[in-house]
Amino acid sequence: MAGTGTATKALARHILKVAPKSAKVVFENAVVRVIEITMRKDQRIPMHSHNKGLSYSLNKGKIRSMDEYGKSRVFNVKKGELSWSDEGESHVVENLGGILRELSIEFKG
């Protein structure tokens, strides 16, 4: 069962586990889980992953994201911007601006 290892890997490093003070569940049902993520200026969230889903920016900001292979990219995030994430994609995120807030809408199963 190839999918089992990926799901376990993603769950072990899920953002709710590595950043419990920054990430909180604001809605959950059988289909989706919505997580509100708040990052302080210069805050760094260690290597983590999300389930497959969308991220919605509640305000503008600037972040640096580094994937599990060391590739680093800087993003200027716009208020209202949507982005897609595949399940198991791991990354470190560093907030390069002021307080940053987003909603992570994760699909289950």
What are these language model-derived features?
Residues 1-36, 44-47, 73-78, 82-86, ...:
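A short, N-terminal "cap"/entry segment at the start of jelly-roll beta-barrel domains
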Residues 50-69:
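Glycine- and acidic-residue-biased ligand/ion/polar-headgroup-sensing regions
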Residues 48-50, 91:
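Histidine-centered divalent metal-coordination motifs
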Residues 92-96:
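Asparagine-centered strand-capping/turn motif at beta-strand->loop junctions
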Residues 39-42, 51-52:
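Short coil/turn motif common to extracellular beta-sandwich-like domains
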